């Protein structure tokens, strides 16, 4: 597929694409170490990017990529640790395909940051976000919904819906919901604790395993929705409800636990001088994480002239 003159919408909007999933999907299909498969991967990536750009009604697209390093590994020792337990071999052409995409399409990537974080940093303005990752829905603004191929608006407050077997969430409501439940995909415990246990019966009898004890999905939905619908500021009410649960579980150490879990889940929105990212804090205090040193920088002040997108 190629653009022609009739394809040019002249809208001034740019589609910001989480390209990791596009590249991975193509590499899973064409997984032979051959020039033929690599050519097919490039065709598939180009086609998908153009299709999404057309669906969003945008004039241009920027692909965002994840590198092999992540600042969250500097925060905790077990980020995504569950993925290492039964790690499958990566598609043989994956690294090559990422390099090709970076060299041949308009791309943004940064060591220590995921594509999700970069999408957060570059959000706003005349941009629309596309991603199949549920976590990106915490970023307010226009998103291209993958299932309907329609552009939808996510508000800052967000929404939370109990759909029975699944929970739909976005915006701050979704972020606070995840602060309570954690994210088992990335081994984020949320408002909970990991407890060593042993199977007492069955085929695994005697084997050790780790169980999470804490706020579960149904309880989290009730807590957040009750706070959301209470009188007053819904954003402040939801935040206080999350604070209360962490205080109940962790006592005097609640703030450290809350901010650690929140920053594992939070999509970065601000970066300065190519290394200092603004952290989420429960009381809105200014605090930055140094990507180079891998530590919180307590005395950093961003230059007044920067816009928070310096990569």
Set out the residue ranges of the language-model regions.
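Extended two-metal-dependent nuclease catalytic cores across DNA- and RNA-processing enzymes
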Residues: 2, 7, 58, 82-310
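Domain-level signal for Mg2+-assisted phosphodiester chemistry and nucleotide/NA-binding surfaces
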Residues: 1-96
């Amino acid at each position: 597929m190629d653009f022609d003159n009739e394809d040019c919408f002249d809208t001034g909007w740019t589609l910001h694409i989480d390209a990791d999933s596009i590249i991975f999907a193509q590499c899973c299909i064409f997984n032979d170490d051959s020039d033929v498969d690599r050519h097919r991967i490039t065709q598939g990536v180009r086609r998908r990017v153009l299709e999404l750009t057309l669906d969003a009604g945008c004039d241009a697209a920027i692909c965002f990529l994840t590198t092999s390093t992540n600042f969250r590994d500097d925060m905790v020792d077990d980020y995504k640790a569950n993925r290492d337990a039964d790690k499958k071999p990566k598609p043989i052409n994956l690294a090559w395909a990422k390099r090709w995409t970076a060299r041949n399409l308009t791309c943004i990537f940064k060591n220590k940051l995921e594509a999700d974080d970069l999408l957060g940093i570059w959000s706003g303005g005349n941009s629309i976000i596309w991603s199949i990752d549920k976590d990106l829905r915490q970023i307010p603004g226009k998103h291209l919904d993958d299932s309907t191929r329609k552009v939808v608006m996510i508000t800052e407050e967000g929404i939370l819906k109990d759909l029975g077997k699944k929970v739909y969430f976005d915006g701050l409501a979704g972020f606070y919901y995840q602060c309570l439940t954690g994210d088992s995909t990335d081994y984020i415990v949320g408002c909970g604790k990991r407890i060593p246990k042993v199977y007492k019966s069955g085929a695994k009898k005697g084997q050790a395993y780790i169980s999470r004890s804490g706020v579960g999905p149904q309880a989290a939905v009730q807590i957040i929705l009750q706070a959301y619908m209470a009188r007053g500021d819904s954003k402040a009410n939801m935040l206080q409800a999350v604070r209360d649960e962490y205080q109940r579980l962790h006592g005097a150490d609640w703030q450290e636990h809350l901010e650690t879990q929140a920053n594992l889940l939070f999509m970065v929105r601000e970066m300065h001088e190519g290394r200092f990212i603004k952290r989420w804090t429960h009381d809105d205090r200014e605090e930055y994480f140094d990507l180079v040193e891998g530590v919180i920088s307590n005395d950093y002040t961003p230059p007044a002239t920067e816009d928070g997108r310096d990569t």
